[in-house]
Regions:
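Membrane-spanning alpha-helical segments of multipass transporters and channels
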Residues: 1-177
Length: 177
């Protein structure tokens, strides 16, 4: 059994579904919210689509890793619940993260997704009047920030897919021996 092919085929099928999901979410969001165009790399609508797609794919890759590590469905659901709470707590949206919390946030999908969405929509300048704490490098409306966020989302996805394959391969090899 070629476990890499199994993991990659699952990831590919998920990606195909997520392209449709990202398109639906983006079109719905853009039509309801009327997002101002910032045009860092592409039209803001396209940047939002790419960000949502990368967030969905990185989240699915994390799910693949969880399902590879935990054989029991009940355990996997509990782990996913903890991961979902972590997405909110370590996203950098609720409060400023420092120290260990900042380090944990560096592997959180939501943190990089929110950073990319904030960069695409120039969240810093658009919400400055609120003084809501959104001003910061996380939401800098720069090409470098946007690309950095996208790269981190892609890296998280790649690491999770490779880790899922390695976990399955090690488990398979142990059962064979």
């Amino acid at each position: 059994v070629n476990l890499l092919a199994v993991v990659l085929s699952k990831a590919f099928v998920l990606l195909l579904i997520e392209v449709a999901q990202a398109a639906i979410l983006t079109v719905g969001f853009v039509n309801v919210v009327h997002v101002p165009q910032n045009h860092l790399l592409f039209e803001t609508d396209v940047e939002i689509f790419i960000t949502v797609l990368l967030m969905l794919f990185a989240s699915s890759a994390t799910g693949l890793l969880v399902s590879a590590v935990f054989r029991s469905g009940e355990t996997a659901i509990l782990v996913v619940l903890v991961l979902m709470i972590g997405q909110v707590v370590f996203s950098g949206i609720l409060f400023t993260l420092t120290g260990a919390a900042s380090a944990i946030a560096s592997v959180i999908v939501c943190r990089w997704g929110m950073g990319a969405l904030g960069a695409s929509t120039d969240l810093n300048s658009r919400l400055a009047w609120l003084k809501a704490g959104f001003v910061g490098p996380m939401y800098d409306a720069t090409v470098a920030n946007l690309l950095g966020c996208w790269q981190m989302l892609a890296l998280i996805a790649a690491v999770c897919i490779v880790a899922a394959w390695l976990v399955l391969q090690i488990s398979f090899d142990r059962r064979k021996a």
